[in-house]
Amino acid sequence: MFRRGLVFSRHCHYSLIRPRFPLNRTCLARFADGRKNLATDNRTQTYQSWRGMISIRALLLAAATSVGLYAYFQHEKKKVLERQNDKVLATIGRPQLGGAFSLIDHHGNRVTDNDFKGKFSLIYFGFTRCPDICPDELDKMSAAIDIVNNVVGDVVYPIFITCDPARDPPQEMAEYLEDFNPKIVGLTGSYEEIKDICKKFRVYFSTPKNIDPKKDDYLVDHSVFFYLMDPEGKFIEVFGRNSTSEDLARAIGSYYLSRKKQK
């Protein structure tokens, strides 16, 4: 009985400490290889992930560099074109618009082109009985002058020259200009004086034939432009009816600042 128990005890002890399904070396090797392959896969995935992130960063950096280079070359191209344009203008000159004149201002004083040198001049041709175009353009001029005065100061003379001197004496001009910017200077004169200044600026104007300015009501057909002159009285640029007050102010301010830098 004791021997049976001893055998049974040994058998149980042997069974407990010995695995029912023994692991041979092949299984252990496969297990080790699996862990090794898993680690390799993890490292590969991590490397590929970092490689993908680096590729994205490289693409973004390349794109940003391309945009920066494009903007830089566009800026340089613009500067080159501006220099070329300046050389052309210096060679062939700007259109010969403007010139000497002697007219009467809306206060009744005789003035010449020399009285308006030292500042820029913004000149418009029209007449006081103009129903719509002239008032709109003078409103535009008034707004542009206000902008310029607020940004860079009092650097421009706004000038309104009549194309209808027979009906626009100084007093008529003064009353008409009360509705606009007080800085605007009205200029009138004899028919020949007005004809001469219009010819120098290539301004077209026409009045009906066989009329009496004191009795007949009529309209004057004329071209609609603003003429910007520099402080020496030389022509700079012309602006059509589609130009806004902001366009006028921007141009005046730009030319003023450009001249200021050159001094």
UniProtKB/Swiss-Prot annotation:
Q: Does the keyword Magnesium apply?
A: no
Keyword Chaperone set for record: yes
**Record-level GO cellular component terms:** mitochondrial inner membrane
User: Could you tell me which Gene3D superfamilies the record lists for this protein?
Assistant: Glutaredoxin
Task: Note the InterPro entries from the entry.
Answer: SCO1/SenC, Synth_of_cyt-c-oxidase_Sco1/2, Thioredoxin-like_sf
As for subcellular location, the record says: Mitochondrion inner membrane
This chain belongs to which protein, by name?
Protein sco1
- What is the native source organism of this protein? Schizosaccharomyces pombe (strain 972 / ATCC 24843) (Fission yeast)
